[in-house]
Amino acid sequence: MNSQVSARKAGTLLLLMMSNLLFCQNVQTLPVCSGGDCQTPLPELFDRVVMLSHYIHTLYTDMFIEFDKQYVQDREFIAKAINDCPTSSLATPEDKEQAQKVPPEVLLNLILSLVHSWNDPLFQLITGLGGIHEAPDAIISRAKEIEEQNKRLLEGIEKIISQAYPEAKGNEIYLVWSQLPSLQGVDEESKDLAFYNNIRCLRRDSHKVDNYLKFLRCQIVHKNNC
């Protein structure tokens, strides 16, 4: 009896693992636009961008957990972390009620500003992680994967704006991550702290982007009927 239960549990776990693997492979290979001029219908384009943003947030979360497990040894280290993120100066909705008060074209440009702002910290993470003592390959590979998928996410968001709100193109705000020089610091703890803060902030922002895109898909594509 116990062996049958164990076999069923093992089978279920295997199916979940295969499902996750197929999902990741699908996201990695699915083009944001199916043609050079991107004639992908807006509902399908939203579906692809939402799937991609969720995948990126999952990668950020995995990377944060891995870094936390490898380098964060005590609460004292966490206490030193800066609460504010470089993008905190950007006024973004905190919940669905606030998001409903923001015009969709404005929210799309806020999303674009956040995603664009990830380019430099991602590059610095990939460059700097190689110099960290015993940096796990899993963290480095995830950072590289995020950098690649981030380009596709930017393309998808820009295509959505072009299709739905062409008059709003070019209205994004360009943000600079002021903490980046700390990633090149000499002191080992300072560098680890800078990496921790940046990965934490990237994860936080990716969660915002994921939620905003899901909200906008519901609002624009499904007319709030979801």
From Swiss-Prot:
Keywords: Disulfide bond, Hormone, Lactation, Phosphoprotein, Secreted, Signal. It holds the Pfam family Hormone_1. It comes from the Eukaryota. Residues 1-29 form the signal peptide. Disulfide bonds join 33-38, 85-201, 218-226. The modification Phosphoserine is found at residues 53, 117. InterPro entries: 4_helix_cytokine-like_core, Somatotropin/Prolactin, Somatotropin_CS. The keyword Disulfide bond applies. It is found in: Secreted. The keyword Protein transport does not apply. One of its GO terms (biological process) is negative regulation of nitric oxide biosynthetic process. GO terms for molecular function: hormone activity; prolactin receptor binding. GO terms for cellular component: extracellular region; extracellular space; secretory granule. SUPFAM superfamilies: 4-helical cytokines. Prolactin acts primarily on the mammary gland by promoting lactation. Belongs to the somatotropin/prolactin family. Interacts with PRLR. This is Prolactin. The gene is Prl.
